[in-house]
Amino acid sequence: MAKEKFDRSLPHVNVGTIGHVDHGKTTLTAALTRVCSEVFGSARVDFDKIDSAPEEKARGITINTAHVEYNSLTRHYAHVDCPGHADYVKNMITGAAQMDGAILVCSAADGPMPQTREHILLSRQVGVPYIVVFLNKADLVDDAELLELVEMEVRDLLSTYDFPGDDTPIIIGSARMALEGKDDNEMGTTAVRKLVETLDSYIPEPVRLTDKPFLMPIEDVFSISGRGTVVTGRVERGIVKVQDPLEIVGLRDTTVTTCTGVEMFRKLLDEGRAGENCGVLLRGTKRDDVERGQVLVKPGTVKPHTQFEAEIYVLSKEEGGRHTPFFKGYRPQFYFRTTDVTGSCELPEGVEMVMPGDNVKVSVTLIKPIAMEDGLRFAIREGGRTVGAGVVAKIIA
């Protein structure tokens, strides 16, 4: 079968299921594709196919992730589901599958469990902006008061981690019933349809990359005689046009320059857009004033920083990571976008050491400033070998 053309007419939103092991994340994922295929005509994906998720690599780390898609009336959803807890941690920290919103699946029969809490905390740390709750397995709970109790517990937990617990939509249902095409007490297909409608209404349409302020990590710098200095890279977001004022941020003092030309595949263009690899010609900037690892940005939008809090995942020995734990004062290289910068780690109070395979919050101090914002991803390296991954949770200085 020929690949279907990607439908650009519907706005595109990235979501994913999070929650404790065996609370029904994968069943709900399969049920979503089934219900949407029947109601809105998107393709159906079976449980087994989602459960045997293929491996993929992100920032040197292997992660198992299943990707499915489905449509509502007004949107196209790309949905990620991970088989194991470690895969979630890695996925969220590396940003392999960035989410515009998450569906927290919690078993009504068991209530919130340790991974329920951990996934909410991770969502907060890595900047997942919206969470919608699906209280699953409600067909196994006869007591309405018990359902209410679990709902209150989930709301409290969300509020603990600065999500709006009282206003978070909670849908009660049974993913298994929906997957089997049943709908007793409107707990099956109706509940899943309601979930899709809630995703439509509660998760706002994400700002398109081209509408965000311009940012391009600098990969290479060339000097072209008679024309000046050209920096090349892939535009991460926004648009750069000829004559735009720009700033060069990171590693040294911020400098101001102007775009005098944009090139792609040796052709001159009027502008460079998000996702494109291009060269930007800079007025009055010398070849030695710029280096790989800096970023080219719209003036005033990004600042350089050296101190931040981060959520990190440390690779296990089996994943090619360290064989031994590290302690406070650990000094690896932090790889941001296109370059390594050395930094030292402070551990949270009461944490003596960090073992391979752990995820932990650390405070980092870099020896040189890097252009950064909350949510920026990085790799942790020792002599060019990836030993971990992280995300900036909060900038300190």
From Swiss-Prot:
Region G5, residue ranges: 174-176
Top enzyme class: hydrolase
GO CC, alphabetical: cytosol
UniProt GO MF annotations: GTP binding; GTPase activity; guanosine tetraphosphate binding; translation elongation factor activity
Chain residues that bind GTP: 19-26, 81-85, 136-139
Region called G1, residue ranges: 19-26
EC number(s) from the headed UniProt entry: 3.6.5.3
Region called G2, residue ranges: 60-64
ATP-binding recorded as keyword: no
Function: GTP hydrolase that promotes the GTP-dependent binding of aminoacyl-tRNA to the A-site of ribosomes during protein biosynthesis.
UniProt cross-references to NCBIfam families, sorted A to Z: EF-Tu (TIGR00485), PRK00049.1 (NF000766), PRK12735.1 (NF009372), PRK12736.1 (NF009373), small_GTP (TIGR00231)
UniProt-recorded name of the protein: Elongation factor Tu
Organism: Pseudomonas savastanoi pv. phaseolicola (strain 1448A / Race 6)
Originating gene: tuf
